[in-house]
Every structure is written in structure tokens, then in C-alpha cells.
Amino acid sequence: MLVAGNALNCLFIDSSGFQRYLGFGVTNLNGATVKSYKQEGFVIDERGKLKRFNRKKLSRKRCGSLRGRGWKYGSGFVDGIFPVLSPIAQKILSFIQKETDPDKVADVLGALPSTHASWDDLINVSVQLRLNKKWDSIILVCEWILRKSSFQPDVICFNLLIDAYGQKFQYKEAESLYVQLLESRYVPTEDTYALLIKAYCMAGLIERAEVVLVEMQNHHVSPKTIGVTVYNAYIEGLMKRKGNTEEAIDVFQRMKRDRCKPTTETYNLMINLYGKASKSYMSWKLYCEMRSHQCKPNICTYTALVNAFAREGLCEKAEEIFEQLQEDGLEPDVYVYNALMESYSRAGYPYGAAEIFSLMQHMGCEPDRASYNIMVDAYGRAGLHSDAEAVFEEMKRLGIAPTMKSHMLLLSAYSKARDVTKCEAIVKEMSENGVEPDTFVLNSMLNLYGRLGQFTKMEKILAEMENGPCTADISTYNILINIYGKAGFLERIEELFVELKEKNFRPDVVTWTSRIGAYSRKKLYVKCLEVFEEMIDSGCAPDGGTAKVLLSACSSEEQVEQVTSVLRTMHKGVTVSSLVPKLMAKSLTVN
């Protein structure tokens, strides 16, 4: 009988069933030993077939048990072997997913016998938690193994912990574990370096990621022999943070220069990268490249490619990829269908998206929450707010709880219709359903009130944001500056501009362009140039919108020529800020 107070009762309820299914030797509270079981287990091979394996025979291989071969970053279990969770492992998993108290976890795990089978169960549970993205739970289990258990931790345990801390942006803890690994005289694996690099990239510390590559060379790993796992982790880590697109491309090019052959996963990452940057033509180019290199695309490749075209509303191209996927013998899953629906939604064809939705159901693929959200968005974009609400209600009827995004998409649909009453009702319903409106929702209401000229309500929301849990962000001020600019309240614009700087917000190109646009509407050409000079001096690069509002401020052909001349210099490497004072001087002379 395996009982250790209430904590264990919640984990091991049926002791007879426990012995019948698990049967390994366990010492109970009275010191008696439970009879051990036959060393036999089950695995699912790479073809999805259930097979038996002899745990005893496996445990006598190098390193013992599944140590050193049980888990590998990026591929689950090595050699296509995915051990099925044993009954005791399933109970451990269920308990760990609910428990957050380290002491209770230690009490329960401490009752496990110090056997290879227990070790395998713990590692299998940790890997399953990783698949479920339960980073806190992984930390609870692996920290217990490392600090408090009688088990001898191995590199797998360290790697799982480094991964979990990296995912939580706790790079210092990941770094500390790497140092501890070295001090414990373990040899870092390629996975160790890959996960540490990814942790640094996710934290925005690219320089430290480069240091890890140097560290690899110090351990006699030359640049030519750095594996694909490390490069993939580097690229993936850079992709986790906005603004690192060029750095990720550089790593991909370096990888090819070092003659490290990209894998399907590498190409999938890069196709996704270009897709998110709205460069579907580059995604397509990479797809063609991988085919020419005999690198076989998988379902994730096609999903990424359909998504790339979907973001630009290229539904015909997305459908071609969908057909190619099926010609290659792959079965579309819910993610592919969702991506194809998104392409029709972005292209402004809600009924096309609805046809894909029906096709998905007809083919036996169950729509998920994202599928319904896409349909709400598709109808909302087309101004069919009643249809959007019908999908929203159908989702609730089926027991799919609407998320913040679901409410936001419905809110956006009615906002486009300028239906204030309905929008206010949606926000109220969110609170009643336990989904508290966030800054994004309040910004949407702010924009709606502003567009309708209801400035009192707009200022009321701003006051709530200053005193409530949802604080204002740079988008809040961009909306306010744009609304007041269109209304001609120039003094209020300057007050808001000072206020956002006091709150340590950095004005972006939208902020500056909205501010210039306010003066442009009044044809205050010189003031527009002054603000433009401030913008350049602050290090903010103008875009097409900035050029448009500057040109609209011009009231003569000469002013148009002056502005055009300055804008052209942006593409010739000339310092624009040095030309603005001259332009202003000419303008004042003319006036």
C-alpha cells in the first residue's frame, strides 16, 4: 500500500490497481516491500504502431534506463520512440498539472521508489508537460530531481530546465543551470547549447547568444561542425521577438555558408519568418529551394506557406498550395483549413471562407475556436456584423468558450458599423463572463468614441486607464493624437505629446505622422517641417504616411518641390535633418 498522507491520496487512490498495473518494488510506511513486476513496457514507433519493449534490457544499455536517449530537443524522443505514459506516470502528470506548491510536489514525488522505471516516468511526464507548454510544472519536477531527490540528474534534466526557464524569459536561471551543469562535470550536448542560445534570443540578448557559439568552439566544436539543431534554435529564438527578422536571415545565410544543410524544420521557420514579414514571394522562393534540394515538405511547411499568402489576402495562391498539399499525399488538418479560411477573409470574401469552413466539417475535420474566430472576423471585415454575431453565438452554443480575441473581433465588427450601444453591450458582457477588457479593447472603444465625436466618453476611458488595471500604451496616445488632430484641437495634441514622454513612451512613426497631420490640415507648412525635424532628430524613420501628410501641407508648387527633394534624399544616404533647416529657411523667405 502506497500512502503518505493526503498529498499522496490525491495521486495514488487505488493501491490494488497501482500494484496490479505497475507492480514495481515500493517500500511502504511500515517498511514492507511491494512485489516487483515484469520489466515490460509499450512504445509507439515512428509509424504509430504500438510495440512492446523490455525495460530491463533497455536499462542495461549505456547510461542506464532512458538516460541519454530519452528526450531530444526539437524531436520529442530519439529514434522515433515515444514511450506511452504508464498508469503511475499518468497519475503523476494529472497531479503535477494541478499542484503548484513545491513542498506538496516534493512530498508526493519523494514517495516514488528510486528505480529506473520511476526515472523513466518522471522524464516522460516532463516531456509531456513540455508538449503541453506547462513550463512551471516542468520546473517543479526537474528542480525537485536536481535539488531534493535521490536520483542522479543527467543532461536531459538540465536541458529540460534550461528550456523551461528560457520559455519564461528567465535567462539568468537558464544561465545558472548551464554553469551548474559544467561544475557537476557533465558534458553539454548540442541540445544544451541550442536551448541556451534560444533563451538568450528570446530575452533579446543576441550578443550572449553569439558568446555561446564561441563557448562551443572552446569545447572543440568548430563553426563548420555546429549542428542544425543549434542553428534552428538560434533562428527560432530570434523569431520570438519582433524586430529580429534581419538577424534571423543572417543566421540562416551563415548556416548555409558553414555548409550545414537546412532541414525541413529550418525551412519551415524561414517560410514562417517571411510570411509574418508580408513577403510571401520569399516564402515561395524558399519552398522551391527546399524542393530542389530534395528536402521533403511536411504539413507544417504547407501550413506556413498558406499562412504567408493568407496574410496578404492572396487566396488563389493559398488554394494552389492547399491543392499541392493533397497531391503530395498529405491530409489537411485544422491549421491548414484555418489558414485557407484566413486568406479568403483577408481578401474580403467572407462567403469563400464559409465554404472552406463547411468543407472542413464535411471532410471530418472538427473546427476549433480559431476557426470560429476567423469566421467572426471574416464577416466583420465585410461589414456583415449580424452574421458575425450569429457565428459568435453558435460557438457559445457548442460549448466553446469565447476568448478575449473572440469578443474583440465581434467588437470590431460592430465598431465598423458605428453601433456604440452594441459595442458597449459587448464590453459589459465580457466583464460578466469573467473576461476583463484589456488595453486593446479600451483602445478600440476610445477610437470608436473619437470617430463619433464623443470626446467626453473618450476622456472618461482615458481617466479609467490611468487609474485602473489596464494602463494606456503608445497606441492609446496615437489614437488620441489622431482623433484630436482631425478635430483641430492642436493644444490638446501638444499636451498629449508631452504627457506620453513623461510616461516614458517612445513616439513611433504613427505618433509623429499624426502630429504632423494635425498641422498639415491647417496648412501650417513651417510647423510641419519643425515637427518633421524633431522626428528625424529623435531617430524615428518616416514612412509613406509621413510623406503624404507633408505633401498635403504644401500650398504651392515650390513647397511641393522642396518636400519632394528632402524625401528623395532618404533613399540616397543623405542626412535628412541637415537639409530640413535649409528647407525651412527657404520657406520663410518665400512667405
UniProtKB/Swiss-Prot annotation:
| Keywords carried by this UniProt record | Repeat
InterPro entries referenced in this protein's UniProt entry, alphabetically: Pentatricopeptide_rpt (IPR002885), PPR/CCM1_RNA-binding (IPR051222), TPR-like_helical_dom_sf (IPR011990)
Residue spans of the PPR repeats: 154-188, 189-223, 227-262, 263-297, 298-332, 333-367, 368-402, 403-437, 438-472, 473-507, 508-542, 543-573
Similarity annotation? Belongs to the PPR family. P subfamily.
| PANTHER family from the UniProt entry | PENTATRICOPEPTIDE REPEAT-CONTAINING PROTEIN, TETRATRICOPEPTIDE REPEAT (TPR)-LIKE SUPERFAMILY PROTEIN-RELATED
Protein name per its UniProtKB record: Pentatricopeptide repeat-containing protein At2g35130
Where is the organism placed in the taxonomic lineage, from the top?
Eukaryota, Viridiplantae, Streptophyta, Embryophyta, Tracheophyta
